[in-house]
């Protein structure tokens, strides 16, 4: 809710395998002051949003975790940010220190959870993502891309669905199906 209370249900979407490109694209675009493309992820108000296996580029800043409730969600593993690549931010601000958030807090989960903010656009190595206006971009990865391998789906937030099976059930004495 707008107050960030602990009321249920808690906003807790799970995003996986996204390529997210902001308006600043390859980092050469300058937008006017006051534009609304400052942060790729602004997690606030007790959200428990989780993001896995995602590549992000094209913003001034990367991940902003705002407020003690959101910090508690990270520490409690309700909010998970894992195996993501945040690349090519104009000012190098891949993580943002908000009130109550310290560099040690980010370090406690950033690298252990497989996140990377050191990769460059050249290392991501898209086929032809940043094209001239009117030319269709190609967001596939070239051979040798650092992002081509490494996705993982082992976190408990991912669930498995068992295949339906057949079982013998006794409906009444002596009869089975």
What is each of the regions a protein language model found here?
Residues 1-177:
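Extracellular beta-rich repeat passengers
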């Amino acid at each position: 809710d707008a107050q960030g209370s602990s009321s249920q249900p808690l906003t807790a979407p799970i995003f996986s395998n996204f390529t997210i490109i902001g308006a600043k694209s390859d980092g050469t675009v300058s937008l006017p002051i006051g534009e609304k493309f400052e942060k790729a992820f602004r997690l606030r108000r007790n959200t428990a949003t989780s993001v896995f296996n995602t590549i992000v580029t094209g913003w001034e800043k990367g991940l902003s975790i705002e407020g003690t409730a959101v910090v508690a969600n990270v520490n409690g593993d309700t909010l998970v940010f894992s195996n993501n690549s945040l690349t090519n931010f104009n000012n190098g601000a891949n993580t943002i220190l908000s009130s109550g958030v310290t560099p040690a807090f980010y370090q406690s989960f950033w690298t252990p959870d497989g996140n990377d903010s050191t990769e460059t656009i050249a290392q991501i190595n898209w086929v032809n993502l940043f094209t001239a206006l009117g030319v269709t971009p190609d967001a596939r990865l070239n051979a040798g891309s650092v992002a081509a391998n490494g996705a993982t789906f082992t976190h408990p937030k991912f669930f498995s669905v068992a295949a339906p099976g057949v079982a013998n059930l006794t409906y009444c004495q002596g009869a089975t199906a």
